[in-house]
A protein has these predicted regions:
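A domain-level signal for the structural core that forms small-molecule/cofactor-binding pockets
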Residues: 2-115
Length: 115
């Protein structure tokens, strides 16, 4: 963790390769100073059928899932930094947003913790 799961309209990946898109979000997260670089996970899921309001408009939405312990200000700065970067890369995309959700350390488990 943390996980950055990006949902976007499929036209986004027609203008930039997925690997490059992932790298941009990864770089912003790594430079935030909030995470160990090797722990950051980024992935994209593109959609061909969707509605934004009542129409099919291009969109990018980043869902960040991070372990508890960061301040509201840190989480807000992370969102702002990612949205700022994506806005610079996709200036014609009308809908770009991000939210940050926290999960409890006490309930988190991964394979390495089992043994």
């Amino acid at each position: 963790m943390p996980h950055f799961i990006i949902h976007c309209s499929d036209d986004i990946l027609q203008s930039m390769p997925q690997s490059e898109f992932n790298q941009h979000v990864y770089s912003v997260a790594a430079h935030s100073g909030l995470f160990v670089s090797g722990d950051i996970k980024v992935r994209v899921q593109a959609f061909s059928t969707y509605l934004v309001g009542e129409q099919q408009q291009s969109f990018i939405h980043v869902f960040a899932s991070i372990m508890q312990g960061r301040t509201v200000e840190q989480r807000a700065a992370l969102s702002r930094a990612v949205v700022t970067k994506l806005t610079s890369l996709f200036p014609d995309t009308p809908n770009i947003a991000m939210n940050v959700d926290e999960f409890e350390k006490a309930t988190y488990c991964n394979k390495a913790m089992l043994g």
